[in-house]
Amino acid sequence: MDTKAFTRALKKSENYNRQGFGHAQEVATLMQSAYKSNLIQQIRENNYTLQRGEVTIKLAKTFGFCWGVERSVAMAYETRQHFPNQQIWISYELIHNPSVNQDMKDMEIKFIPVIDGQKDFSVAGNNDVVILPAFGASVQEMQILKDKNCQIVDTTCPWVSKVWNSIEKHKKKKFTSIIHGKYSHAETIATSSFADKYLIVLNMTQAQYVCNYILNGGNRDEFLAKFKQAYSEGFDPDLDLEQVGIANQTTMLKTETEEIGKLFERTMMKKYRPDQLNAHYQNFNTICDATQERQDAIAGLFNEKLDLMVVIGGFNSSNTTHLQEMAIENGIPSYHIDGAQRILSRNKIEHKPLGREVKISEGWLPEGPVVVGLTSGASTPDQAVEDTINKIVAMKLVVMN
């Protein structure tokens, strides 16, 4: 499929909207009430610090809703305002936040069901409204919705669209796209759908394996087994790694994306000589500003003397997971929760350790004065951060009283 021609035609369709419906002021009031927090604003104005009894909270200087997420949520609210009586669907979670997705359900916005790992778009009627989430949607999904004559409301983050543009540039030069991301993540599924040839690498270890294969060859069957589900149909590592372009899932670790890009650059220079680099390697900066800012902000917190970190965000949120990863790498006890309800008591917290299932841990909140570093992922509203702060303070007060 000519994906560039398809998306160009789709955007000209009268059934396509990515600008909203003129209800911005009304929606802003609703979102202020639902997601903003006076307490959080006060903490920002107090050098991102709150002192309550034995608890000192140190907030990262950038956290929570990013511009792309806020835009996506606002467009969903606008869509319900504009189509008060029509059936509205979301093709996936709007964002990776359980409370916001519940708000969508409370507005009688339904989610396209997933059956045996596949989205069942047959439930959407020809005149239904379908919202594409902040992560975007695959070309194939958009084609289905266009063919069904659905009203498409596209809330894809512009940073994600920027990555798609890079993929189109790779494709124009017949390069294979090397995508730094998680092959099962909604954004990476959407991004890879724009490529003719692609390979998804999760981390530096996988990137090093690929680069070693480029330089020295290897066992083709082993390669394909190692990257099962992470490459395009018909991909051949012996033929399709001679010209590569770098792209990324926007929520991956900035430093790792940069290191992977440099590794492939060095590899192609070594394989084909420096003067031939441009014929074999492309890299465009597609690291999301919001992701970078939140990672830089938590790094700034590490200069403080912290007893522990609490990281708030959906358990399936990639950008939140990477914030958690940074805290752990800096040797700080860290707890990833998706809301204040996970703080069960002064002694118990339900959280998701890095790379593991949700569990309950004991002894998470130290005795005596405690300094808690706190941040949240790009899909987490300020109100969820306030609720968590209040719960932590309340747990300490129980002991003091």
UniProtKB/Swiss-Prot annotation:
Cofactor: [4Fe-4S] cluster
Key word RNA-binding present: no
Pfam families reported in the protein's UniProt record: LYTB
Keywords for the protein's UniProt record, in alphabetical order: 4Fe-4S, Iron, Iron-sulfur, Isoprene biosynthesis, Metal-binding, Oxidoreductase
UniProt-listed Enzyme Commission number(s): 1.17.7.4
Listed Gene3D superfamilies: 3.40.50.11270, 4-hydroxy-3-methylbut-2-enyl diphosphate reductase, catalytic domain (3.40.1010.20)
Cofactor, free-text remark: Binds 1 [4Fe-4S] cluster per subunit.
GO molecular function, one term: metal ion binding
Protein family according to the UniProt entry: Belongs to the IspH family.
Protein name: 4-hydroxy-3-methylbut-2-enyl diphosphate reductase
Organism of this sequence: Trichodesmium erythraeum (strain IMS101)
